[in-house]
Every structure is written in structure tokens, then in C-alpha cells.
A protein has these predicted regions:
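A compositional/biophysical signature of low hydrophobicity enriched in polar/charged and small residues
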Residues: 1-77
Length: 77
């Protein structure tokens, strides 16, 4: 199982609409509105890393109102 965490920034006024669209996407396990440098934190899990990253590139980044993302890949030790 591959896990990534996506840190997302959105345009002013877009937080609610973006937050509602993300849980509908494949492999999304959790969505949280956060404080600090980013607006939203998303946990995505999938069988393969390509599958998980596709959710980011073809899903989250395409949502109107998303201005930037940073993806953190969980490392299994």
C-alpha cells in the first residue's frame, strides 16, 4: 500500500468548494482543513504509487480554485 499526503493552497473563497470535491476522488482517505502555510491536507492511499499520484495530477490539481500542491510520499522503514 502506497500513501501520500498532499498539501494544498486554494484561491480566496474557494476553500469550501474545493474541500467538498476532494473526498469524491478515487483513493482519497481523509481531507482536513488546516492552519499555517497550507489550506488543506489530504491523505491518499493506493496499491501503486502511480495510481496515487494520478489522483493528485489528474484530480486534485485540476479542481478550479486550487493554486498549488505539494505532495509528500510516505516512506516505509
Amino acid at each position: 500500500m502506497e500513501t501520500v499526503y498532499v498539501l494544498i493552497n486554494v484561491e480566496p473563497g474557494a476553500l469550501e468548494s474545493v474541500t467538498k470535491k476532494i473526498p469524491e476522488m478515487k483513493n482519497v482517505k481523509d481531507v482536513a482543513v488546516v492552519t499555517g502555510a497550507y489550506d488543506i491536507l489530504v491523505k491518499i492511499e493506493g496499491e501503486y504509487i502511480t495510481e496515487v499520484l494520478t489522483t493528485v495530477v489528474r484530480g486534485i490539481r485540476q479542481i478550479e480554485g486550487v493554486t498549488s500542491t505539494e505532495t509528500l510520499v510516505e516512506v516505509k522503514l
